[in-house]
Each structure stands twice: as C-alpha cells, then as structure tokens.
C-alpha cells in the first residue's frame, strides 16, 4: 500500500468548497476522488488538510491518498492533471510514510486574504480579491490584528454551525502588507473554526474603515457574541500553506 501526498492549488470560485458532502456535490474533494477512482477502477477517498468553504481558493492545500497499486508519483500527478478541471491543479505528488495523515499531522495553517484598495476595479483580480474603494487605515488594522495573536476562545469569530469540542485556538502571527494597491492579510495559526478567518478579516476591515476601534477586538473576543464580528466575502481568501 502506497501513501501519496498531494499538493493542490485551485480556484474555488465555482465550487461548494473542499469537502465532499454527498453524491454529485460540486466540490474539490469530489472532483479529485472521481478522477482517482477512474484511474484505479474502484471508489477512492482522499483526506484533505483543510476544509475550505465555498468560493475559497487554495495555493497550498495538502491531501493524501492510499493506493494498493504501485503507481509512480509522476504517473499519479500526470493522470490527475490530465483529467481534472483546469481550475484544479496538482502541483506535486510525493510518497510519504504509511502513518502520514494530512489532517491529523498538520501543525499550522496559513491563510491569505487579498483586498484591492483602489478607486477602480482591477480587471484581472476582480474574482480573486475583495474590492474596497475607500482607503483603509492600515495602522489601525495592524494594531487590531495583534489582539488576535495568542490563545483565545474564538466563539465570536465562528459560525453557529461549528460543532468543535472547543472554540479555543492559537494564532501565531498576523501580518498586513500594502503591496501596490493590494492589502495582503496573512493569518497563521494551529487551526481555524468554520468561517473564523473571514470573520477576523471582516472585523479588521471594519477597523480599517473606521467603523470599529482597534481595541474592540478584545471586547468581541470576550463577549463570545457572533453578531459583533464582521464577515468578509470568500472571494479574497486563499489557503496559502500548511506545515507538518
């Protein structure tokens, strides 16, 4: 039995997220499993590191799949890229130890959120970034972002559908960079609740627009009140990388 680790990139714009929810669901996981199943002639299931929401993109999703066949990594990669839709790519395939599990062995995940902060639409990135015309106050956003760093109960920044045993997570770092009209927000942590990054970014945007004070981040965290947090569109969000 061979355990293959897949590095995956995708444009999530037309999909219902990563996780296969049932037969016929238009998901990234479902598309990859369909191609692998055709390759080996039986039903195949893969394990993904991160369950991205509908519309969210990935630059560094990781999955693993166990196959009894002795395919080379080149054969697996070439077959997948030949038959997957053009908005899903497998960038690397490697053989890993049998015990490797892409979800349970993941230590940290990094998400990137892209904002186009100019008074005109970016013709090429309009589907891959959130457009905000009003100039954002970056210094206030940076100040607010650092209040997320550390271990906190992120109930206020989770979705009501979240069914985790605990809503406590640790954020290792948040950086905000102004890059030629784009504002790139990177969030690195040990794990994320459903909609957590989008709610964090949405709140930072409200701070940048002057709708909230930076210090209110702590108030919202302590309140555990989901209605107090902002919510950013999925368009600008990317799963950038996972460390093991």
Curated annotation (Swiss-Prot):
It is an enzyme of class 5 (isomerase). The keyword Isomerase applies. It comes from the Bacteria. Keywords: Isomerase, tRNA processing. Substrate binds at residue 111. Belongs to the tRNA pseudouridine synthase TruA family. Homodimer. PANTHER family: PSEUDOURIDYLATE SYNTHASE (PTHR11142), TRNA PSEUDOURIDINE SYNTHASE A 2 (PTHR11142:SF22). HAMAP family: TruA. This is tRNA pseudouridine synthase A. It comes from Bacillus sp. (strain KSM-64).
